[in-house]
Amino acid sequence: MKDTVSQPAGGRGATAPRPADAASPSCGSSPSADSLSVVLAGGGTAGHVEPAMAVADALVALDPRVRITALGTPRGLETRLVPQRGYHLELITAVPMPRKPGGDLARLPSRVWRAVREARDVLDDVDADVVVGFGGYVALPAYLAARGLPLPPRRRRRIPVVIHEANARAGLANRVGAHTADRVLSAVPDSGLRRAEVVGVPVRASIAALDRAVLRAEARAHFGFPDDARVLLVFGGSQGAVSLNRAVSGAAADLAAAGVCVLHAHGPQNVLELRRRAQGDPPYVAVPYLDRMELAYAAADLVICRAGAMTVAEVSAVGLPAIYVPLPIGNGEQRLNALPVVNAGGGMVVADAALTPELVARQVAGLLTDPARLAAMTAAAARVGHRDAAGQVARAALAVATGAGARTTT
């Protein structure tokens, strides 16, 4: 049976999951004739959850009466991230998706049936007007439930679906769902989804609205950098990245000699081995994680980072040039994520195996001491970045939910 992370009166907030045998509470504020119910299906990784939360915020900004329900699984980051953002979360059985068609895909119907039933119960409980899916473990059951599968004893009810694909190479759940979705949106062209409209990746409002120039002095003071510093920002995701840590920390002496300040988020499980700072060296600020990314972006002139969809979206949205180091596993999607920015001139790609202290020192010093080239890369990154992706997805969802004939019962 599905679980729920319930909310207090007023339609938002979260408490502990209810017992599995408890009755489902009403989700969001009380339904009314003029309030729309939107179910956001995106769980598992931050790359699925964060765009969903950005769209939730955009929906509420467009229509404060909208009722938001996030659909997730017990194993995903949504169990922490969704309640933190103040939205209601319903949990269903996780259905891991195979990367490629084959035997696992052939056995998928037996695995997914329970999750589809649970998803359908959620859609009925909240009287859903539209499902917005972001891929991942929870998306396919939501798409199938919204399609109106004839699961007795209830009548079929089709709910419109909007799909957003954040990666350059669409995952299996979104490839399946796109065949019958009402609208298909993607981060980049050529994602593998037909009819896809390119909107970028939804990012948090604090990032989308960031004016780096206005916030720069405050941001640099926050981290202890001089106003006129040349600042390199390094991060490898929520857990850091060992290869980035080694390469950049190994280049610390050369970076200091070039007058480069460093803000380095190395990950809570990692430890940096740094040389003792010499008198007169620019600051090298090493932290386990950054909880104010807007300040980090505002302080920086250049970034070294991975190339996950959310990372590329945020870095390009704020107009930061970057050295992208794709994760050297998977099917190469991280490199594909970075290519639109790189091809536009807003960054470069360096293979993980090629990232050495010598390369870091040479490339970073070369860029940060060449104002004309850095300015050109900054402008290119800003041109290709998408600041209003969350708003575009939210507007598409509301349009589909209110469209004539969008919702039918047979």
Swiss-Prot record:
InterPro entries: GlcNAc_MurG, Glyco_trans_28_C, GlycoTrans_28_N. Pfam families: Glyco_tran_28_C, Glyco_transf_28. Residues 14-34 have a biased composition (Low complexity). Its EC number is 2.4.1.227. Gene3D superfamilies: Glycogen Phosphorylase B (3.40.50.2000). GO terms for molecular function: UDP-N-acetyl-D-glucosamine:N-acetylmuramoyl-L-alanyl-D-glutamyl-meso-2,6-diaminopimelyl-D-alanyl-D-alanine-diphosphoundecaprenol 4-beta-N-acetylglucosaminlytransferase activity; undecaprenyldiphospho-muramoylpentapeptide beta-N-acetylglucosaminyltransferase activity. One of its GO terms (biological process) is carbohydrate metabolic process. Residues 1-34 are annotated as: Disordered. It catalyses: di-trans,octa-cis-undecaprenyl diphospho-N-acetyl-alpha-D-muramoyl-L-alanyl-D-glutamyl-meso-2,6-diaminopimeloyl-D-alanyl-D-alanine + UDP-N-acetyl-alpha-D-glucosamine = di-trans,octa-cis-undecaprenyl diphospho-[N-acetyl-alpha-D-glucosaminyl-(1->4)]-N-acetyl-alpha-D-muramoyl-L-alanyl-D-glutamyl-meso-2,6-diaminopimeloyl-D-alanyl-D-alanine + UDP + H(+). GO terms for cellular component: plasma membrane. Keywords: Cell cycle, Cell division, Cell membrane, Cell shape, Cell wall biogenesis/degradation, Glycosyltransferase, Membrane, Peptidoglycan synthesis, Transferase. It is a peripheral membrane protein. Its main location: membrane. It is found in: Cell membrane. It is an enzyme of class 2 (transferase). UDP-N-acetyl-alpha-D-glucosamine binds at T45, A46, G47, N167, R204, S238, Q334. Pathway: Cell wall biogenesis; peptidoglycan biosynthesis. Cell wall formation. Catalyzes the transfer of a GlcNAc subunit on undecaprenyl-pyrophosphoryl-MurNAc-pentapeptide (lipid intermediate I) to form undecaprenyl-pyrophosphoryl-MurNAc-(pentapeptide)GlcNAc (lipid intermediate II). PANTHER family: GLYCOSYLTRANSFERASE, UDP-N-ACETYLGLUCOSAMINE--N-ACETYLMURAMYL-(PENTAPEPTIDE) PYROPHOSPHORYL-UNDECAPRENOL N-ACETYLGLUCOSAMINE TRANSFERASE 1. HAMAP family: MurG. Belongs to the glycosyltransferase 28 family. MurG subfamily. This is UDP-N-acetylglucosamine--N-acetylmuramyl-(pentapeptide) pyrophosphoryl-undecaprenol N-acetylglucosamine transferase. The lineage of its organism: Bacteria, Bacillati, Actinomycetota, Actinomycetes, Mycobacteriales.
